[in-house]
UniProtKB/Swiss-Prot annotation:
Quaternary organization: Homotetramer. Forms an RuvA(8)-RuvB(12)-Holliday junction (HJ) complex. HJ DNA is sandwiched between 2 RuvA tetramers; dsDNA enters through RuvA and exits via RuvB. An RuvB hexamer assembles on each DNA strand where it exits the tetramer. Each RuvB hexamer is contacted by two RuvA subunits (via domain III) on 2 adjacent RuvB subunits; this complex drives branch migration. In the full resolvosome a probable DNA-RuvA(4)-RuvB(12)-RuvC(2) complex forms which resolves the HJ.
Name of the protein this chain belongs to: Holliday junction branch migration complex subunit RuvA
Gene that produces this protein: ruvA
Gene3D superfamilies, A to Z: 5' to 3' exonuclease, C-terminal subdomain (1.10.150.20), DNA helicase RuvA subunit, C-terminal domain (1.10.8.10), Nucleic acid-binding proteins (2.40.50.140)
Highest rank taxon of the organism: Bacteria
Length: 204
């Protein structure tokens, strides 16, 4: 089991990063709520990971804190929720916000998450509500709002929009939906990470 990695960030392409560890490069997918907290390119990062082995691939999912990883591990145990949907859910809501939605049985907000319909939202409520009681509650104390990492300003608005649309598609949105979300909030001074963050928040 690979549970923690420490290395230099070589590439950032939401929701992916390329992490260099002693000359070896590792592709890691992160939920956007964690991606926002990454340091700049060329800087060192510590990533808490969940390793998934499939017949056709070995995949690493990364998180800023063990609390996100713990929540992801519980999410993918839910019937019909795989790693891709688990990543999308934690991109649309932080772990704390997700727990709050479960405790309040807030289906209306859950169904706004990419890939989550009414049946999936109801299943999440039934299967997750008891599971979160078994998690260490100290992991889920309120934390400060996630901060966006600054990025180079030489990216054009169009390339930022294209990158944001690509990231939303990776998180489960249909291409037309992703394009419309970005179109609705696009501004020349917004980088790709800001566009993604605003787009996800606009669905809640």
């Amino acid at each position: 089991m690979i549970s923690r990695m420490k290395g230099i960030i070589l590439e950032k392409q939401p929701p992916w990063i390329l992490l260099d560890i002693q000359g070896m490069g590792y592709d890691i997918q992160l939920p956007m709520t964690c991606f926002y907290q990454l340091p700049e390119l060329g800087q060192e990062a510590i990533i808490f990971t969940h390793f998934v082995v499939r017949e056709d691939a070995q995949l690493l999912y990364g998180f800023h804190h063990p609390k996100e990883r713990a929540m992801f591990s519980e999410l993918i145990k839910v019937n019909g929720v795989g790693p891709k949907l688990g990543l999308a859910i934690l991109s649309g809501m932080s772990s704390e916000e997700f727990i709050c939605a479960l405790e309040k049985e807030d289906i209306s907000n859950l169904i706004k998450l990419p890939g989550v319909g009414k049946k999936t939202a109801e299943r999440l409520l039934v299967e997750m509500k008891d599971r979160i009681k078994n998690l260490n509650k100290n992991l889920f104390k309120s934390t400060a709002d996630h901060m966006l990492s600054s990025v180079s300003t030489d990216l054009s608005a169009k390339s930022a929009e294209a990158e944001a649309i690509s990231a939303l598609i990776s998180l489960g949105y249909k291409p037309q939906e992703a394009a419309q979300l970005i179109k609705n909030i696009a501004q020349p001074d917004l980088d790709s990470q800001a566009l993604i963050k605003h787009a996800l928040r606009s669905t809640l």
